[in-house]
Amino acid sequence: DTGKTIWEYKFNIFQSDVPPHRVAWASPAADPETGNVYALGAGATVIALSGDGKPLWQRSIGEEFAAFTTHGGRTMSPIIDGDLVIVSAAVSNWGTQAARSHRIIALNKRTGDIVYVSNPGGRPYDTAYAAPHIATINGTRLLIVGLGDGGIHAIKPQTGEKVWSFVAAKRAINTGVVVRGSTVIISHG
């Protein structure tokens, strides 16, 4: 009722190309079941905080998957589905994960352990910061999101299994989708 800050949690950004006036584009996600808050920072670090702002765990997607957020810290908002907190990032790694891609990464919301890594799209042209959306369409629960390859992709949020993709643009999709019944509405400009 007062507008006063209840708590604040600050953490370091270890990427030198992120200017201080553009420090990430994602909103945190609050979990109504646990009261916890999840954030994906400009350095591609996922942080879990209790409802009173105490750190529970953190995971560096930037270090583990070579995720990059580019100038300005373009990151997607995390989304919660059941026991998962799901994030996404453009990556370019070594070995079996060397191919540049835009991966969707699901973590156990209580422990931060990786549950799955999904790669539903093609090679990204840009990083993307579209908000993911979860909807049930024709009886199937889907996570639908625009990625850096210019496509809108639908996966099963509990398994990461790709259901469908639609290439909508030549560059990243940076707007969230709207779902009405069984219709997915996208915009890009």
Sequence positions of predicted segments:
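Noncatalytic, solvent-exposed loop/strand surfaces
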Residues: 1-189
